[in-house]
Amino acid sequence: MKIAVLPGDGIGPEIVTEAVKVLNALDEKFELEQAPVGGAGYEARGHPLPDATLKLAKEADAILFGAVGDWKYDSLERALRPEQAILGLRKHLELFANFRPAICYPQLVDASPLKPELVAGLDILIVRELNGDIYFGQPRGVRAAPDGPFAGEREGFDTMRYSEPEVRRIAHVAFQAAQKRAKKLLSVDKSNVLETSQFWRDIMIDVSKEYADVELSHMYVDNAAMQLAKAPKQFDVIVTGNMFGDILSDEASMLTGSIGMLPSASLDKNNKGLYEPSHGSAPDIAGKGIANPLATILSAAMLLRYSLNRAEQADRIERAVKTVLEQGYRTGDIATPGCKQVGTAAMGDAVVAAL
């Protein structure tokens, strides 16, 4: 089994190193091949997603991704900025389903900004569609307004759109995920205002006829954002579009105490996927050895489970992470009084020892 390892920028190389360390500690050995991406790709090959990196990603059975982005690239034209690498990978590999778990570990309840009784036992899965919506809809741009009260003035515009096949395929993925959990699925939209959202809701209802064992409900995105902060444990699996999912998954991540704990998976129709931590590249702490590698290590566990069908090995890694937390090890972002505060490499070593 071949894994493409794309560390990226900022803290990416540090946290990916620890995930690779954990993978190498397993009984089964994998072929790991590394390539530059993001700002590192631009520096090495003049593009955030070099041809050789894309070729490796296509040939691999799965991709372990760090993070991309750095302020020093903000002056580049948009097509050359590091963030275009992840968008390009999603497009070329046809990764359309993003899984973002939000789990509050018992040992980290006090790290959450919410009261312990609100988050104890929290276990949410957000399924986000990745390829459509306003992020990719055309036309888009800046122009002179053709009409309206400010006709002739400059305006920016984007297009929110979804095709029926796009909505149906993410619906099936979400319903199947719900079948494996509590058999509850919440679809989040803004159908009281947006035609695209009403279209989304209608298709969700239609697809639900194929999943009689799953209870489908609906919620407007503004209410969902409020309810995530007010009573998050009412949710199990949430399915939503690209933009709403982007926002809600970041909100849900903070309920757990630290975004540094949360993995994610982006899958194609055959479960080949790209696995990355939910957090960004954090260039302000890059090279300091203090970043939390657990989200990346847990992303490696998701990689084993979903793309390589190695559920037992994935379980081992997840149990090891829980053991490390029970032993009191903490990086700075999840540190609490009386804990054993450690750096990036020491946390990786602790997980390997727990294996």
Swiss-Prot record:
It comes from the Bacteria. The keyword Heme does not apply. One of its GO terms (molecular function) is NAD binding. It is an enzyme of class 1 (oxidoreductase). Pfam families: Iso_dh. Substrate binds at residues 90, 100, 128, 222. Mg(2+) binds at residues 222, 246, 250. This is 3-isopropylmalate dehydrogenase. It comes from Burkholderia multivorans (strain ATCC 17616 / 249).
